[in-house]
Structures are given as structure tokens and as C-alpha cells.
Amino acid sequence: MQYDLYVVTDEGLSRGLTHPELARRAIAGSADVIQLRDKKCDCDYLLRCAMEMREDCNKAGVTFIVNDRLDVALQSQADGVHIGQSDMPLKFARRVAPKGFIIGVSAGTVEEALRAEHDGADYIGFGPVFPTGSKADAGPVCGLDLLREVRRRVSIPVVAIGGINAANAPEVLAAGADGLAVISAVVSQEDVTAAARNLKAIISQYRLSGRQ
């Protein structure tokens, strides 16, 4: 699975676009992963969004992940779920999920990352690397040094998140991130597709340079 550009949808931070609209525009900008994240909407709306986004992602060959809601992820036949430290236990999610189902886990410390790997996570969402206003529950800033340490200590993919944008993306990649998860750097922009495409070009250029 390719994690290079991992776009998290957020209607509250968009310019009036719905989750499916954000996803379609990010997909057009060459996003590799789309995560549906909404802590406030009702379950019916979330499921409708998930079904529509899963279809669009499948057509484009893009991985589709649902944040937190394993029930919605399973009902919509998403590729996986992403859970935080205060969400359901990873071991429970793994027991319930079908074979091949992707489970990502948020981590903000080396210990949390190691535990997630031990418990069977497929990847780690590590951060916030930089200060961010996109997530009220983001936790304390981790920084690039801690990102390097986590990348050194775990063998599963590490996707960096938190305050990442086009300006600082190269240094996050240089710290060892396998992918960049972004919210406002894409979904809050006037042209979502162009913002995604620009970030993907930065990542691709970095990869092609042979620095990673």
C-alpha cells in the first residue's frame, strides 16, 4: 500500500464542500489515501458519505479509510479504519475486522508506536509533528526528532500528521515519514485538487531524488 499523500476530509475546515466532494477533488489531485473523518455528524449521514467515497476511491484505485467508526468502515466496505489512543482497542478491531482489513493507529510517543506495532497495526499515524489547528484533540507537538526516533524503532509504515504543508513537507520526508497526512493543507484551500497535486509533486520529486 502506498501512503505518500494521505488526505483527511473535514467539512468544517472546507470551503463549503462535502466529504465526498472533497474526496473527489483530492483524488483528482493524485491522493493515495482518503480518510473520512467526522466526529460530529450523525451515523446515517456518515454512512452515506462513506458509501459514496468508497465507490469513488475504488474506481480510482485509491485506498479508503474511515476514522474511528469501525461499524461504518465495515458497512461501507472501506479498505480500513483509523483509530486513536482513546478509541476502541486495536486488538478488538483486529478480531472483528475481515482478513486484509487495514488498521491504522494514532501515536504521539515512541511507546505508543511500539505498542501499536506489537498489537497488529498496519501503519502508524504519528504526530502532531508541528502545531496544528485542524484537530482539537491532536495532543502535544512531537517534532521531527521524535518522528526520526519512531521511524528508527518500528518496522511498519509511519505516516506523519499535524501542521504539514508544502513548505515543510520535504523536511518531514527527510525525517523518515513514509507518507504525509494532511487536512487543512488540502481541504481548506480554494482549489483542493491543485493543493493535493502540488503536495504529491513535492513528494514524488523527493522520492525521485533518491534521498529516500
Curated annotation (Swiss-Prot):
<dbReference type="InterPro" id="IPR034291">
    <property type="entry name" value="TMP_synthase"/>
</dbReference>
<comment type="function">
    <text>Condenses 4-methyl-5-(beta-hydroxyethyl)thiazole monophosphate (THZ-P) and 2-methyl-4-amino-5-hydroxymethyl pyrimidine pyrophosphate (HMP-PP) to form thiamine monophosphate (TMP).</text>
</comment>
<feature type="binding site">
    <location>
        <begin position="183"/>
        <end position="184"/>
    </location>
    <ligand>
        <name>2-[(2R,5Z)-2-carboxy-4-methylthiazol-5(2H)-ylidene]ethyl phosphate</name>
    </ligand>
</feature>
<feature type="binding site">
    <location>
        <begin position="35"/>
        <end position="39"/>
    </location>
    <ligand>
        <name>4-amino-2-methyl-5-(diphosphooxymethyl)pyrimidine</name>
    </ligand>
</feature>
<comment type="pathway">
    <text>Cofactor biosynthesis; thiamine diphosphate biosynthesis; thiamine phosphate from 4-amino-2-methyl-5-diphosphomethylpyrimidine and 4-methyl-5-(2-phosphoethyl)-thiazole: step 1/1.</text>
</comment>
<dbReference type="GO" id="GO:0004789">
    <property type="term" value="F:thiamine-phosphate diphosphorylase activity"/>
</dbReference>
<dbReference type="InterPro" id="IPR022998">
    <property type="entry name" value="ThiamineP_synth_TenI"/>
</dbReference>
<dbReference type="InterPro" id="IPR013785">
    <property type="entry name" value="Aldolase_TIM"/>
</dbReference>
<dbReference type="InterPro" id="IPR036206">
    <property type="entry name" value="ThiamineP_synth_sf"/>
</dbReference>
<dbReference type="GO" id="GO:0009229">
    <property type="term" value="P:thiamine diphosphate biosynthetic process"/>
</dbReference>
<feature type="binding site">
    <location>
        <begin position="132"/>
        <end position="134"/>
    </location>
    <ligand>
        <name>2-[(2R,5Z)-2-carboxy-4-methylthiazol-5(2H)-ylidene]ethyl phosphate</name>
    </ligand>
</feature>
<keyword id="KW-0808">Transferase</keyword>
<feature type="binding site">
    <location>
        <position position="135"/>
    </location>
    <ligand>
        <name>4-amino-2-methyl-5-(diphosphooxymethyl)pyrimidine</name>
    </ligand>
</feature>
<dbReference type="GO" id="GO:0009228">
    <property type="term" value="P:thiamine biosynthetic process"/>
</dbReference>
<keyword id="KW-0784">Thiamine biosynthesis</keyword>
<feature type="binding site">
    <location>
        <position position="163"/>
    </location>
    <ligand>
        <name>2-[(2R,5Z)-2-carboxy-4-methylthiazol-5(2H)-ylidene]ethyl phosphate</name>
    </ligand>
</feature>
<feature type="binding site">
    <location>
        <position position="68"/>
    </location>
    <ligand>
        <name>Mg(2+)</name>
    </ligand>
</feature>
<keyword id="KW-0460">Magnesium</keyword>
<feature type="binding site">
    <location>
        <position position="106"/>
    </location>
    <ligand>
        <name>4-amino-2-methyl-5-(diphosphooxymethyl)pyrimidine</name>
    </ligand>
</feature>
<keyword id="KW-0479">Metal-binding</keyword>
<feature type="binding site">
    <location>
        <position position="87"/>
    </location>
    <ligand>
        <name>Mg(2+)</name>
    </ligand>
</feature>
<comment type="similarity">
    <text>Belongs to the thiamine-phosphate synthase family.</text>
</comment>
<feature type="binding site">
    <location>
        <position position="67"/>
    </location>
    <ligand>
        <name>4-amino-2-methyl-5-(diphosphooxymethyl)pyrimidine</name>
    </ligand>
</feature>
<dbReference type="GO" id="GO:0000287">
    <property type="term" value="F:magnesium ion binding"/>
</dbReference>
<dbReference type="Pfam" id="PF02581">
    <property type="entry name" value="TMP-TENI"/>
</dbReference>
<protein>
    <recommendedName>
        <fullName>Thiamine-phosphate synthase</fullName>
        <ecNumber>2.5.1.3</ecNumber>
    </recommendedName>
</protein>
<dbReference type="GO" id="GO:0005737">
    <property type="term" value="C:cytoplasm"/>
</dbReference>
